[in-house]
Amino acid sequence: MTAIFLMSMVFGLACGQTMSFCIPTEYMMHVERKECAYCLTINTTICAGYCMTRDINGKLFLPKYALSQDVCTYRDFMYKTVEIPGCPDHVTPYFSYPVAVSCKCGKCNTDYSDCIHEAIKANYCTKPQKSYVVEFSI
């Protein structure tokens, strides 16, 4: 009986990890500043995918922090910095953005993640695009 219980626990843990499809995914974002002449298209990675979660029936009896569900979020990330071309001298031309190195299923941390249900559909350029990108690692 102990062997069956142990095997079911191992199988459950293995399936839980494989069913959680949360990985760094390629993402293209457009960056522009009001004062600068050009828009940059940046290829980066973000955390995207599905996480195993379950809904608790006894919601009335639990504290609010116990009701949050896991989301696909950053485990490790680094920042890269690009220079937006065509900026006047009084404007800082640098823009820093996160690059996902690895991801995990966990609580959404508003210190470094945008924890909204639906994204704002503003990922496009309104200015001419510049073809070169100079990156700096920070």
Swiss-Prot record:
Disulfide bonds join 22-72, 36-87, 39-125, 47-103, 51-105, 108-115. Pfam families: Cys_knot (PF00007). One of its GO terms (molecular function) is hormone activity. Glycans are attached at residue 43. Residues 133-138 form a propeptide. PROSITE patterns: GLYCO_HORMONE_BETA_1, GLYCO_HORMONE_BETA_2. One of its GO terms (cellular component) is extracellular space. SUPFAM superfamilies: Cystine-knot cytokines. It is found in: Secreted. GO terms for biological process: G protein-coupled receptor signaling pathway. Gene3D superfamilies: Cystine-knot cytokines. Indispensable for the control of thyroid structure and metabolism. Heterodimer of a common alpha chain and a unique beta chain which confers biological specificity to thyrotropin, lutropin, follitropin and gonadotropin. Belongs to the glycoprotein hormones subunit beta family. This is Thyrotropin subunit beta.
